[in-house]
Amino acid sequence: FIEEALKGFIIDERIGMVSGKILRSDRITLDSTGLFLSLWRTAKERGYGAKDKGQFEKEGYVFGVNGAVAFYHKAMLEEIKENGSYFDANFHFFYEDLDVAWRAQRFGWKGYYIPRAIAYHVRGGTARSSCGIDKPYARIYLSDRLHADLIKNRYLTIIKNESDFGFWLHFPAVALYDFVMWGYILLFRTQLIKPLLLNWKFLKSAFKKRG
């Protein structure tokens, strides 16, 4: 994996993020073939949950790379670091890889996918309960604290990286997504409201980090 992945950095001097085809532990289910930014401003793993049938065998540019097995160019990390840190300590869990990718894109860096570099990832092995490992619909298996982190970190990522133009362009999609999400919270996960309110203190810091 390492040998193949590192070849990506010699293709273009502005490639700062490289990863390969990430499979689940069953070695046939795709976990990620590149990280992308969705219209509703969530992290989108290309190929997530699909069976590997050779549909992602073409290497090429991607928005970012999954943090499970990511290679980052040191020059890129040095250029995009915030307050001396590469990763935002306020995130705790989730969205760090999208935050890094979005920051890197704003600075003119690129991500690259190499399908010959194959790795295996136990999805949820760190954050989920044992019954949720390698299962879809991650939110179901998260503790309340981690679920709150997931929601909070999406907002922090948007605040830090979205341009004014991008905000208004994607506002309808984001508003629709948030309407559904908050409806779910109010109906089924009301216990998330308190930790989410406690997390609002991080918003001020995020606004200060806007590029």
Where are these regions (language model features)?
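A short, conserved alpha-helix in the catalytic core of glycosyltransferases
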Residues: 3-5, 63-81, 85-125
